[in-house]
Amino acid sequence: MTVTKMSWRPQYRSSKFRNVYGKAANREHCFDGIPITKNVHDNHFCAVNARFLAIVTESAGGGSFLVIPLEQTGRIEPNYPKVCGHQGNVLDIKWNPFIDNIIASCSEDTSVRIWEIPDGGLKRNMTEALLELHGHSRRVGLVEWHPTTNNILFSAGYDYKVLIWNLDIGEPVKMIDCHTDVILCMSFNTDGSLLTTTCKDKKLRVIEPRSGRVLQEANCKNHRVNRVVFLGNMKRLLTTGVSRWNTRQIALWDQEDLSMPMIEEEIDGLSGLLFPFYDADTHMLYLAGKGDGNIRYYEISTEKPYLSYLMEFRSPAPQKGLGVMPKHGLDVSACEVFRFYKLVTLKGLIEPISMIVPRRSDSYQEDIYPMTPGTEPALTPDEWLGGINRDPVLMSLKEGYKKSSKVVFKAPIREKKSVVVNGIDLLENVPPRTENELLRMFFRQQDEIRRLKEELAQKDIRLRQLQLELKNLRNNPKNC
């Protein structure tokens, strides 16, 4: 297979998406005053669905994130309620694709947690998770929900392992142990039968997740891969990374033959990470650079030249990360085909950016809104773990978004276990895993000691009072 070097010049061709343009929301429709995390981990720190926006925030003594109803735009108060149950920095958050108020988070405290957000949003700080999942020995950097199966969650840790969790029982059911360094990115194909990963060991892998077997592997020496995404049903992968000349680069791969990339294209000489986003409905690819304000977009086809440049959205405000609205949350009346939620750290701002196809008619445009994966799962955890693959359940966007009422998350009931040694419950008193957790435990113990000392002092005073009263009674028996 020969490698085709693509020109930087845009290649125009007949396309219904050649005039797509980006439109940033007005300031009153943005989310302002948010203390966005300063963590340098290469994640988006943002997740969005048709009802809520979640953003990882800067906090001391543990990790936290905000969950804001989408209609609550404008300035967010500093004391706005947070989800703050983690003992370490939160590194990734993802909404359940089938249940709008269930969100997963992972943290430096080695745990993965599942949270249930009330329908109207948070009224007070949430510290108790619906589920706490412990299985990694080091920090957990990534979480991903299975695209077609309810209650199957993947987590990748700095222990080089990927754990597959069945949330029906709250336990890990599979472990993928083929990586030799930190996992940078995970992506599923359409039916979730394949998982692709990028890793710090400079390898791109295609994995059968249930068995953990590596089907294809590429040793990317000339194209150091950072991010990867499956391109729908095309049997193609697209990676972003860095070339041997330290320029930002993308590469297109055949998922069944990773010996060489089909094409490579150099983007620019900037140093920020390139985030790829693929829309299988329109076959459009979006490339957004971390630390710059530009979003390039292309159209992908199964025939040469495979990748056709369309346009670029430019903004002077640099982005730290980007959340993406699911298809069923888009405004079809405005011919919106994609929507980003851009994190601008310097301004404490979350800015929605809509990608719009210009059309004169106000009627529903069926040619740009085909049937799309909806909010109903195609499989149960037992079916998927048993080897069944099934395409997503499709929905039409013509009727607009309707909240799913069929899928309900039920946390497994766990019997509390105890191991008592010398009167101490060892499972109740778990040793701290991080320095932040140790400090929190230390200050908590100091407060407890101070409180007990005050109680003891009050009891000493009361005891002396009673002793005096008793002495008086003995000295004056007539007063009895």
Swiss-Prot record:
The protein's name: Coronin-2B
One MF term in the entry's GO annotations: vinculin binding
Residues passing through the membrane, by range: none
Locations listed in the record: Cytoplasm, Cytoskeleton
Source organism: Mus musculus (Mouse)
Principal location listed in the UniProt entry: cytoplasm
Subunit architecture: Binds to F-actin and to vinculin.
WD repeats: 85-125, 135-177, 179-217, 220-263, 265-308
Keywords: Actin-binding, Coiled coil, Cytoplasm, Cytoskeleton, Repeat, WD repeat
Function: May play a role in the reorganization of neuronal actin structure.
PROSITE patterns reported for this sequence: WD_REPEATS_1, WD_REPEATS_2, WD_REPEATS_REGION
